UniProtKB/Swiss-Prot annotation:
This is Ascochitine biosynthesis cluster protein 2. Keywords: Virulence. InterPro entries: Cupin_2, OryJ/VirC-like, RmlC-like_jellyroll, RmlC_Cupin_sf. The lineage of its organism: Eukaryota, Fungi, Dikarya, Ascomycota, Pezizomycotina. Pfam families: Cupin_2.
Length: 186
């Protein structure tokens, strides 16, 4: 594969995050429309990450927009300790990840295209639009198997309690992806 410049949308339409709230009269209203809080290009420019919402605690405090303010000021790393991250990820044709392990719980929903999920135990599944997977700490890699079409996925990432497998603590093992998740404030 030849080296390409980083690209972010791969021919997919721009995403829009619509935020609702309750006005002073108690009516539901749309308060804003944007593309989320943070955006990053990963995987040698073949994967785009859009952080749509993150919270440092559950249940959420939505009084006076505290949740929206926190989300906009705190860029998540891989996930949010004791919280939740809501993320859209787009994959260019043949774009994907290397092997890695994330010590977290992820709901993954395929929105458009196909995503191949491989596990270190030797199993592989190709997920189609509408398919979901619950990723619970395995060493894995993902990739878009198409040579022509992009893939869009939606991720909800939750922290987990310390988990032991055969007496060994399950930890993040990000390999080549270690520097791709930057935590911090805007």
């Amino acid at each position: 594969m030849s080296a390409q410049k980083p690209i972010t949308h791969f021919g997919l339409r721009d995403i829009t995050r619509y935020t609702t709230t309750v006005d002073s009269n108690g009516n539901g209203v749309f308060s804003r429309a944007d593309q989320g809080d943070f955006e990053a290009t990963m995987g040698d420019g073949r994967v785009a990450r859009f952080d749509l919402f993150q919270a440092g605690q559950v249940p959420l405090n939505i009084n006076d927009g505290a949740d929206i303010k926190w989300s906009g000021e705190n860029q998540p790393g891989l996930h949010v300790p004791n919280g939740v991250a809501f993320r859209m990820m787009d994959f260019a044709p043949e774009g994907g990840s290397d092997w890695h392990r994330a010590a977290l719980f992820a709901f993954v929903i395929i929105v458009e295209g196909e995503l191949e999920l491989s596990l270190d135990g030797g199993e592989t599944k190709v997920l189609l639009p509408g398919d979901t997977t619950l990723v619970r700490g395995p060493s894995h890699k993902v990739r878009n198997p198409s040579t022509a079409k992009p893939c869009r996925t939606l991720w909800v990432l939750l922290d987990i309690t310390p988990t032991h497998i055969n007496g060994k603590l399950l930890k993040h093992e990000m390999g080549h992806h270690t520097g791709e998740y930057q935590e911090g404030s805007k």
